[in-house]
Amino acid sequence: MTYKKTDFVPFSADAQRSIANLEAAYEQLVDIEREQGAMPTSMFWQTKNGKDYLAVKKSTSDSGTTQGPRSPETERQFAEYSAERTRLQVRRASLSALVQDRVKLCRALRLPQLAEQQGRLLRELDLHGLLGYDVLVVGTNAFAAYEMVCGARFPVGNEATEDFDLAWCRGTKVSLAAIASPAPRQAASDRASLMSVLKRIDCTYAINRRKPYQAVNDAGYEVELLAAPSTHPLPNGEAFEPMATLVEQEWLLRGTPVRCVVTTNKPASCPLYVPDPRWMAVHKLWLSLKPERNPAKKGKDARQGHVLLDATRYFLQDSCPMGLDFVLELPPALRDLFTAWAEKSGFDPTNPTA
């Protein structure tokens, strides 16, 4: 199957501006939320033996730690905390309203979106520093990001899905920790585990005993963690046990990942961090031929692989070139698939911009 450039529907200039404005507002909002999360949960005066003492709770489960009796120093500390807390609350409310306004505009322009269930999960992963640093989004949910970065609606590929696939990327070249990007606010060993983030959203999430790489909640919603052999073993604190034999996951840790912000059907917004579209495309083509693959998924895999290669050809040649350097980087199994697509599509890797 081959898709012509006319099969894609480019976003308007207004849509492109709206996407950029939404992303800027979301990033500011999540920065404020992280600042709030880093502050003590509360700070208050408590009386003991007729004297006032300043107490601080670092978290909701904290019983409180005394900072000392009332004095000019503790009063200054309390005043600074109160002022900063108020500042962040006001700023968060303002940015939340701004994000909502920009979400409404993006939805009116019918830009790509995810279901709110996926959106909430992605916001929490981002807030706690896992998205991009420890995990990236793979599978069908990634296609909203590919449409956004291409600036065009795909004829196929971005299809509804009832599950959520993540791939482990900590310690790899595609992790934000290895890319020219702000350093993570927490060391890897101090970040929350994937399961702890899921439980913040829904305490009923539990590991599926038959599939230890999968967590399921009481509503039956599934979150799967995939991991390339090179990333094993996972840290001790991770409850997930992904299979160690999925060599094809190595391919999704190549190239240049994509990050963007999309809307959800709540309406709300959420970030996406997904594999390089070139590698995702050939990965999908390979999956469509994998003997062990569920036959019901193979048709979608083939559609997604072909449409993503065509989209990359038409819209991303500057950032994701598919010239000879890329072809030579492909392992033989993927190179044959890419060559077959190129011949059928009339694409010449020696002259990719023709």
Tell what function each PLM region has.
Residues 1-52, 59-61, 66-354:
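Compositionally biased terminal segments of proteins
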